[in-house]
């Protein structure tokens, strides 16, 4: 992934903020790729990555048999911090976006649905919390 960042006209504070944002974006993309690979290794078919609806985004949508799984990926220095970063409002947006995905995919109607939280820590290790609710 190549990202061009223009920094010559920015203040030092703005450049630092932009660099943190770029690092966070790259870290998030690496975490999502790691989790996607793990779901594939477990026999899941990946239907979509970073699927955007009108009200939000779902990081990963996979199918295994009659089960459809909507996965939110969180990365942080620690598992606890990553888990705590998922808010009720964010989970609600993910659920609403999942419903929009299903509205646009009538061939998937009737499948069982689940929401997972994949938590990736700084070392790259991760855990999947299956069937999350708040």
UniProtKB/Swiss-Prot annotation:
Gene3D superfamilies, per database record: 3.40.1350.10
Pfam families the record matches: UPF0102 (PF02021)
SUPFAM superfamilies, A to Z: Restriction endonuclease-like
Disulphide bonds in the chain: none
One MF term in the entry's GO annotations: nucleic acid binding
Domain of life the protein comes from: Bacteria
InterPro entries: Restrct_endonuc-II-like, tRNA_endonuc-like_dom_sf, UPF0102_YraN-like
Family named by the database record: Belongs to the UPF0102 family.
Protein's name according to its UniProt entry: UPF0102 protein Dshi_2830
The organism of origin for this protein: Dinoroseobacter shibae (strain DSM 16493 / NCIMB 14021 / DFL 12)
Taxonomic lineage: Bacteria, Pseudomonadati, Pseudomonadota, Alphaproteobacteria, Rhodobacterales
